[in-house]
């Protein structure tokens, strides 16, 4: 019997792309609009909920200061000590927890853990989980 490949949801793909775009934006210091446009035109967007990708990326950038202020008290190190991927994943998940009430908090946290497993260092998903587990109740999401 052939092993079936698990189909990745369009929203998960949107989150993957948003984390990659946030990472690119953070390390390149290029304009967010340019990053978004080049991402959509140059990356494989097959199977991606593109409107959701755009919403996640644009709004995380727009609300960045508020998102970072929300994250800061729950870190055990400075924001500068986070890897760019950890920062991108935390920012995206915190944006969803804070500004997307239709996304259940467990989904936002689980998606962030999966993103950290995919893109982050070996144990970064554990750190991401710990931080988000503190942020969610502080935002009234648990």
UniProtKB/Swiss-Prot annotation:
Organism: Actinobacillus succinogenes (strain ATCC 55618 / DSM 22257 / CCUG 43843 / 130Z)
InterPro entries xref list: NusB-like_sf, NusB_fam, NusB_RsmB_TIM44
Protein name: Transcription antitermination protein NusB
Function: Involved in transcription antitermination. Required for transcription of ribosomal RNA (rRNA) genes. Binds specifically to the boxA antiterminator sequence of the ribosomal RNA (rrn) operons.
GO molecular function: RNA binding
Cellular component GO terms held in the UniProt record: cytosol
GO biological process: DNA-templated transcription termination; transcription antitermination
Record's keyword terms, sorted: RNA-binding, Transcription, Transcription antitermination, Transcription regulation
Pfam families: NusB (PF01029)
Protein family: Belongs to the NusB family.
CDD domains: Terminator_NusB
């Amino acid at each position: 019997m052939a092993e079936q490949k698990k189909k990745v949801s369009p929203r998960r793909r949107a989150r993957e792309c948003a984390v990659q775009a946030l990472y690119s934006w953070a390390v390149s210091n290029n304009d967010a609009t340019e990053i978004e446009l080049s991402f959509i035109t140059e990356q494989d967007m097959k199977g991606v909920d593109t409107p959701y990708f755009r919403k996640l990326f644009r709004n995380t950038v727009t609300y960045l200061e508020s998102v970072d202020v929300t994250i800061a008290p729950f870190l055990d190190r400075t924001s500068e000590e986070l890897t760019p991927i950890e920062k991108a994943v935390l920012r995206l998940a915190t944006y969803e927890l804070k500004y997307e009430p239709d996304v259940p908090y467990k989904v936002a946290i689980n998606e962030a853990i999966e993103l950290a497993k995919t893109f982050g260092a070996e144990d970064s998903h554990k750190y991401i989980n710990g931080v988000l587990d503190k942020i969610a109740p502080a935002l009234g999401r648990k």
